[in-house]
């Protein structure tokens, strides 16, 4: 009842004050102006958003010269920094702070301060703005302290218009409400992009609500909630995604580039490989053509099956390589007798015969027209014995013998006297050479061949000889040593019978076996005409088989070689003429080229007669006895015709 009376009294007092503004206040007493001003206590208030609040700051002193100041959260509210919805009204002895349409931003601690000459005093109160519809207002009973020092705070009572307040109880009223978007002026209530809504209630004053984004919270969306973190994470996620895309693009580009390079390399390799194959094929074809041309040039025209028994002594005087005189002497002494060694300076005769020869080149046979220069043995070589016939060391001219043995043999042959020129054997030789029935080919022309150089065509002294059967060419190196020595026919038959295995074991030649011709029938006639006795048969050993040899071309009459061999002659050699006469008389009758009728028969008979045994490669058959060598040489030397010479 007292508060109501006070309120009524206040209202009356206000009216009185308004009516009596021009009248001075009566002085109640002298002691009142001397006291410092005191402020009444202000009460804290809680209100909904959009409501109206009033804070009053009153003093018990009626001193006219008082100044009032308001502070919010320690900051003075004046015309410059106070919000638009806040107003301050000054009255004598009191001051009011009115908040129209309170919002969440208006929440805070408000303080009122009075300033006078007598002293200063202050009072504070808290204002809370609630968004919900439930509004609770609690007001505590105010206690008046009549005597409070200026230093102690002064409580100010806060009253809310339109609300019933009591000192001891707090009541809350609820009613129906609805949300309405705030006007444009009121949208500033929400910050940071929040949406403003106003709650209107019939029983309660209107209030404001804010719908904040996810990054912000608070009454007005003023608080950030992990905003920077979300932003940072978003940036990182975006950067990571961009980096991932860049990496994927980079790796893809590298793979495509490698694939393109690989394809280019494969294509280039294939092209170069084809080009190389083409070049190799061309080179091979060119090499093959060159080889075929060389082989054709070397071989000449081919004849597949020539008669192997058609044997000739091929004298080829042209060699591809220039050989020194010493090498020529050694090789010719090893292989054959040089016909220039057995002719004298006064009696020489040469003939040129063109006959088909037989040779081998790379396993093929070829027929060429060769000019065989055969020179008859002169009577100057009558006796070639190095010692007595009893059985001293005798030299033999064989395929593997050295040049020393041949030199010594030729030296002894040169030094023997010309004792067989006037012998009866020479007459027989003349008869054989001059009888028309025998048809002995005698030519009186010198050899001229494109294959023989002028220096090797004939010896230094002009001479004439009869044609002599040539020697067959052998494809084996061991048989390329033609011997102009022969044995009697009966000895040949016996030796061929005693050595069949030896002939078949060495140097098997299927061409001679398959295509060999039978021996000439003239040989049988000669065997009947010229008979020999068994006393001249030497020790049986493998007969020497003379075959057609390519090295027969080296049997060229070289006078220089003969002179060099004559320089090596030994004057101490001794010869026995009596023994050689008897042996030459018997063996000379079996010489095949003395009784031939035509060159064709000679070529057919010479092959089996002058066949060299394959046992020459056998080391045991390399040496022969002196009787056989002497018989062969004497048969050739003794039958020389002194008249024809």
Curated annotation (Swiss-Prot):
Function: Direct ligand for ERBB3 and ERBB4 tyrosine kinase receptors. Concomitantly recruits ERBB1 and ERBB2 coreceptors, resulting in ligand-stimulated tyrosine phosphorylation and activation of the ERBB receptors.
Similarity comment: Belongs to the neuregulin family.
Membrane-crossing residue ranges in chain numbering: 248-268
Compositionally biased spans, kind Basic residues: 547-557
Any GO MF annotation of the entry: transcription coregulator activity
UniProt comment concerning the protein's domains: The cytoplasmic domain may be involved in the regulation of trafficking and proteolytic processing. Regulation of the proteolytic processing involves initial intracellular domain dimerization.
Domain EGF-like stretches: 178-222
Compositionally biased intervals (Low complexity): 165-175, 340-355, 568-579
Positions of the propeptide segment: 1-19
Keywords associated with the record: Cell membrane, Disulfide bond, EGF-like domain, Glycoprotein, Growth factor, Immunoglobulin domain, Membrane, Secreted, Transmembrane, Transmembrane helix
Gene3D superfamilies referenced in this protein's UniProt entry, alphabetically: Immunoglobulins, Laminin
Subunit structure: The cytoplasmic domain interacts with the LIM domain region of LIMK1. Forms a ternary complex with ERBB3 and ITGAV:ITGB3 or ITGA6:ITGB4. Interacts with NRDC and BACE1.
InterPro entries referenced in this protein's UniProt entry, alphabetically: EGF-like_dom, Ig-like_dom, Ig-like_dom_sf, Ig-like_fold, Ig_I-set, Ig_sub, Ig_sub2, Neuregulin
Organism listed in the record: Mus musculus
Gene Ontology biological process terms in this record: cardiac conduction system development; cardiac muscle cell differentiation; cardiac muscle tissue development; cell morphogenesis; chemorepulsion involved in interneuron migration from the subpallium to the cortex; detection of temperature stimulus involved in sensory perception of pain; ERBB2-ERBB3 signaling pathway; ERBB2-ERBB4 signaling pathway
Cytoplasmic side, ranges: 269-645
Post-translational events: Proteolytic cleavage close to the plasma membrane on the external face leads to the release of the soluble growth factor form.
Keyword DNA damage: no
Domain Ig-like C2-type intervals: 37-128
Protein name (database record): Pro-neuregulin-1, membrane-bound isoform
Spans annotated as Disordered: 1-52, 139-175, 340-364, 380-406, 433-463, 531-593
GO cellular component terms given for this protein: axon; cytoplasm; external side of plasma membrane; extracellular space; GABA-ergic synapse; glutamatergic synapse; mossy fiber rosette; neuromuscular junction
Polar residues compositional bias, start-end: 139-164
């Amino acid at each position: 009842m007292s508060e109501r009376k006070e309120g009524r009294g206040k209202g009356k007092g206000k009216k009185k004050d308004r009516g009596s503004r021009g009248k001075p206040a009566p002085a109640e007493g002298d002691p009142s102006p001397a006291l410092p001003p005191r402020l009444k206590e202000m009460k804290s208030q809680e209100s909904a958003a959009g409501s109206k609040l009033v804070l009053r700051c009153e003093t018990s002193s009626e001193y006219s010269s008082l100044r009032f100041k308001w502070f919010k959260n320690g900051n003075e509210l004046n015309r410059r920094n106070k919000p638009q919805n806040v107003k301050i009204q000054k009255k004598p002895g009191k001051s009011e702070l009115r908040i129209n349409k309170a919002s969440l931003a208006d929440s805070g601690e408000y303080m009122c301060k009075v300033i006078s000459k007598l002293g200063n005093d202050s009072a504070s109160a808290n204002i809370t703005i609630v968004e919900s519809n439930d509004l609770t207002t609690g007001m505590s009973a105010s206690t008046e302290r009549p005597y409070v020092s200026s230093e102690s705070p002064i409580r100010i009572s806060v009253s809310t218009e339109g609300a019933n307040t009591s000192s001891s109880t707090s009541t809350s009223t609820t009613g129906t409400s609805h949300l309405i978007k705030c006007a444009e002026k009121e949208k500033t209530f929400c910050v940071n992009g929040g949406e403003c809504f106003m709650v209107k209630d019939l029983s309660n004053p209107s209030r404001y609500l804010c719908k904040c984004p996810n990054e912000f919270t608070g009454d007005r969306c003023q608080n950030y909630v992990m905003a920077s973190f979300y932003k940072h994470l978003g940036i990182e996620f975006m950067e990571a995604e961009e980096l991932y895309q860049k990496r994927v693009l980079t790796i893809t580009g590298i793979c495509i580039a490698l694939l393109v390079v690989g394809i280019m390399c494969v294509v280039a390799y294939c092209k170069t490989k084809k080009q190389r194959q083409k070049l190799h094929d061309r080179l091979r074809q060119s090499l093959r053509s060159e080889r075929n041309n060389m082989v054709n040039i070397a071989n000449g025209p081919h004849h597949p099956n020539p008669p192997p028994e058609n044997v000739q002594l091929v004298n080829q005087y042209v060699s591809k390589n220039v050989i020194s005189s010493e090498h020529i002497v050694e090789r010719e002494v090893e292989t054959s007798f040089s016909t220039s060694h057995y002719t004298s300076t006064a009696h020489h005769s040469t003939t040129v015969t063109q006959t088909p020869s037989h040779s081998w080149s790379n396993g093929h046979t070829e027929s060429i027209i060769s000019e065989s220069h055969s020179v008859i043995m002169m009577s100057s070589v009558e006796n070639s014995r190095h010692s007595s016939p009893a059985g001293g060391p005798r030299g033999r001219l064989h395929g593997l013998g050295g040049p020393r043995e041949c030199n010594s043999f030729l030296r002894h042959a040169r030094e023997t006297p010309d004792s067989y020129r006037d012998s009866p054997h020479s007459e027989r030789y003349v008869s054989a050479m001059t009888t028309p029935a025998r048809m002995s080919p005698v030519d009186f022309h010198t050899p001229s061949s494109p294959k023989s150089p002028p220096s090797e065509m004939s010896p230094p002294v002009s001479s004439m000889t009869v044609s002599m059967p040539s020697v067959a060419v052998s494809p084996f190196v061991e048989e390329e040593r033609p011997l102009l020595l022969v044995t009697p026919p009966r000895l040949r038959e016996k030796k061929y019978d005693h050595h069949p295995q030896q002939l078949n074991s060495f140097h098997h030649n299927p061409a001679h076996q398959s295509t060999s011709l039978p021996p000439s029938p003239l040989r049988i006639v000669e065997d009947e005409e010229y008979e020999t006795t068994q006393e001249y048969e030497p020790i049986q050993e493998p007969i020497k088989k003379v075959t057609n040899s390519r090295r027969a071309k080296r049997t060229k009459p070289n006078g220089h070689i003969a002179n060099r061999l004559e320089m090596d002659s030994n004057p101490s050699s001794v010869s026995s003429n009596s023994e050689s006469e008897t042996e030459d008389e018997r063996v000379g009758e079996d010489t095949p080229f003395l009784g031939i009728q035509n060159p064709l028969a000679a070529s057919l008979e010479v092959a089996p007669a002058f066949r060299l045994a394959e046992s020459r490669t056998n080391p045991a058959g390399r040496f022969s006895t002196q009787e056989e060598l002497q018989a062969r040489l004497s048969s050739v030397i003794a039958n020389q015709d002194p008249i024809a010479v």
